[in-house]
């Protein structure tokens, strides 16, 4: 097992500047500052429930819109996860979690296959939470999937409170990822009949 499963990405555009580091074999330690309080909250939950250590510093044109910052942070998270996973030797590969948050229940199933695909079935009524546009939840996971090479299925099984719905989704993603990145000691190589992911 690689004892240094860490990915770090810096991204600078005319719209945003992001520095992100993720450590897969962590304890859920986090330092997060994105200028978007609700996204800070969700990334904190992701770190805590995945047990991945996460450091994020992001500055962007949030006075215009939060979309650029949300998407670029997700791009960096996806790239950092891909870097940290390396050749994926010994990983469990698949993860699934169903997580409640009061009246809401979300399910996330994922495969660290190297093939990016997002299925997203999460209807929400509220358009904004603070300065965070809820439509960007989909954009966030689309960017993570595309840049990490993950197949992610996200389904809202029930729910009415938008904050609770998004929180359940992020927690379920974190728990599913936690399982998928675990090392299976009996698997000496890559857990694929093709021997590559």
From Swiss-Prot:
> Per the UniProt record, which residue ranges are transmembrane?
none
Task: Give one Pfam family, short name only.
Answer: IGPD
InterPro entries per record: IGPD_sf (IPR038494), ImidazoleglycerolP_deHydtase (IPR000807), ImidazoleglycerP_deHydtase_CS (IPR020565), Ribosomal_Su5_D2-typ_SF (IPR020568)
This protein's GO cellular component annotations are: cytoplasm
Q: Which UniProt keywords apply?
A: Amino-acid biosynthesis, Cytoplasm, Histidine biosynthesis, Lyase
What's any GO biological process attached to this entry? L-histidine biosynthetic process
Subcellular localization, per the record?
A: Cytoplasm
Reactions catalysed according to its record: D-erythro-1-(imidazol-4-yl)glycerol 3-phosphate = 3-(imidazol-4-yl)-2-oxopropyl phosphate + H2O
Q: Give the first-level EC class, as a single word.
A: lyase
Q: What is its EC number?
A: 4.2.1.19
Q: Name one GO molecular function term.
A: imidazoleglycerol-phosphate dehydratase activity
**Please, which domain of life does this record's source organism belong to?**
Bacteria
Q: Pathway involvement?
A: Amino-acid biosynthesis; L-histidine biosynthesis; L-histidine from 5-phospho-alpha-D-ribose 1-diphosphate: step 6/9
Family that this chain belongs to: Belongs to the imidazoleglycerol-phosphate dehydratase family.
Q: NCBIfam families, per this entry?
A: PRK00951.2-1 (NF002111), PRK00951.2-4 (NF002114)
Q: What is this protein called?
A: Imidazoleglycerol-phosphate dehydratase
């Amino acid at each position: 097992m690689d004892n240094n499963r860490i990915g770090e990405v810096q991204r600078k555009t005319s719209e945003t500047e992001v520095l992100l580091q993720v450590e897969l074999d962590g304890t859920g330690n986090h330092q997060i500052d994105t200028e978007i309080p609700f996204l800070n909250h969700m990334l904190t939950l992701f770190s805590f429930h995945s047990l991945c250590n996460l450091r994020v510093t992001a500055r962007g044109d949030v006075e215009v819109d939060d979309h650029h910052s949300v998407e670029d942070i997700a791009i960096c998270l996806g790239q950092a996860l891909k870097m940290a996973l390396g050749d994926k030797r010994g990983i469990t590969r698949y993860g699934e979690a169903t997580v409640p948050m009061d009246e809401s229940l979300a399910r996330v199933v994922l495969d660290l296959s190297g093939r990016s695909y997002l299925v997203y079935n999460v209807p929400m009524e509220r358009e904004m939470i603070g300065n965070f546009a809820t439509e960007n939840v989909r954009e966030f996971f689309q960017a993570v999937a595309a840049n990490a090479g993950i197949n992610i299925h996200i389904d809202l099984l029930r729910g009415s409170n938008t904050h609770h719905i998004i929180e359940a989704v992020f927690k379920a993603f974190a728990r599913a990822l936690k399982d998928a990145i675990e090392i299976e000691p009996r698997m000496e190589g890559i857990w694929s009949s093709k021997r590559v992911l």
